[in-house]
């Protein structure tokens, strides 16, 4: 039933794509007339996690200084923002698992952005899929919110931009991109990295760089492609990893029907790449289907937090298995 709903969702979104402008709410007067998923700073929440404090309490811009880390004069952690997508939440199991993997890996300050109201998560189950266009139009506003928190970190807590990384899934990937644009507009500099996990395709894949996540949004933009309907095969970043060619992920069933599974696999893949060094290896598209066993550090790239330490950029094919940890490298590390 859920797969049928998403199949209908594809058709609806593609029709709406020709009726409305997306990515910038100022471009669409029609969306302003009736918005069932309105954006407000007050409805965006943050879960702030460290190794010492893993409570899933919610904070806002007004209450963030109640958190112990924000009572200090300086924050010395590397900071990672995680942003969910359409009809999801920061408390979804896959995002909490990613946050936990980060904390196991290093002494990070993890900020999960919960914009469920503007992402239409709270709407009636049978109706909210029709509201995708409203959530898409809110992404820039949520990106501006992340930029506001970033400004606080930089100016009040002496966090260098080089210590801040953004991770976003689906619409959350574009939200992260808009945050990257906004911090540059505020003259804060660039984020060290933005990681887009299967960035949403509908409403964005045909847009110019200013209206979607783009390689100029951070010093390094890593994109993981896992679906070609909910996601996109368009190259967007410094490096673009096409997992199993970017669609129909192993273990997700038939094309289209398994699209939702493929779309969410991006989060699972990246979480495994946090847990396991060089879990998944990207082979240059020009050399596909070269086996990863022939890869060297100078031509291939490992997906994950260390991707930017490799010299190669561009598009990469990544073979994956159907079950966690999804590695197809037979223990090879480059």
UniProtKB/Swiss-Prot annotation:
It catalyses: a 1,2-diacyl-sn-glycero-3-phosphocholine + H2O = a 2-acyl-sn-glycero-3-phosphocholine + a fatty acid + H(+). GO terms for biological process: killing of cells of another organism; lipid catabolic process. Residues 24-33 form a propeptide. Disulfide bonds join 37-120, 209-214, 252-261, 278-302, 279-327, 295-300. It is found in: Secreted. It comes from the Eukaryota. GO terms for cellular component: extracellular space. The active site is at residues 170, 198, 263. Not glycosylated. Residues 1-23 form the signal peptide. Keywords: Allergen, Cytolysis, Disulfide bond, Hemolysis, Hydrolase, Lipid degradation, Lipid metabolism, Neurotoxin, Secreted, Signal, Toxin. This is Phospholipase A1 1.
């Amino acid at each position: 039933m859920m797969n049928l709903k998403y199949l209908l969702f594809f058709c609806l979104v593609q029709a709406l794509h020709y009726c409305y402008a997306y990515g910038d709410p100022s471009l669409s007067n029609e969306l302003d007339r009736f918005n069932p998923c309105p954006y407000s700073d007050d409805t965006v929440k943050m879960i702030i996690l460290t190794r010492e404090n893993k409570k899933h309490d919610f904070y806002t811009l007004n209450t963030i200084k109640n958190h112990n880390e924000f009572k200090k004069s300086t924050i010395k952690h590397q900071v990672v923002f995680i942003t969910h997508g359409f009809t999801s939440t920061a408390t979804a199991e896959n995002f909490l698992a990613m946050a936990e993997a980060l904390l196991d890996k290093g002494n990070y300050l993890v900020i999960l952005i919960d914009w469920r109201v503007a992402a239409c998560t709270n709407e009636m189950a049978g109706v909210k899929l029709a509201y995708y266009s409203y959530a898409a139009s809110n992404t820039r506003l949520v990106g501006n919110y992340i930029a506001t928190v970033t400004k606080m970190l930089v100016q009040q807590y002496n966090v260098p931009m080089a210590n801040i990384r953004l991770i976003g899934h689906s619409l959350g990937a574009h939200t992260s991109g808009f945050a990257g644009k906004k911090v540059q507009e505020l003259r804060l500099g660039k984020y060290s990295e933005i990681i887009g996990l299967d960035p949403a395709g509908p409403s964005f894949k045909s847009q110019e760089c200013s209206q979607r996540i783009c390689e100029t949004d951070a010093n390094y933009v890593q994109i993981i492609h896992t679906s070609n309907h909910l996601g996109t095969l368009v190259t967007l970043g410094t490096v673009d990893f096409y997992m199993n060619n970017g669609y129909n992920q192993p273990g997700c069933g038939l094309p289209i029907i398994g699209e939702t599974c493929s779309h969410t696999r991006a989060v699972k893949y990246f979480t495994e790449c946090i847990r396991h060094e060089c879990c998944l290896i990207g082979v240059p598209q020009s050399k596909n289907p070269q086996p990863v066993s022939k890869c060297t550090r100078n031509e291939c790239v490992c997906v994950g937090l260390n991707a930017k330490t490799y010299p190669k950029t561009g598009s990469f094919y990544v073979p994956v298995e159907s079950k966690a940890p999804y590695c197809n490298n037979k223990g090879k590390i480059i």
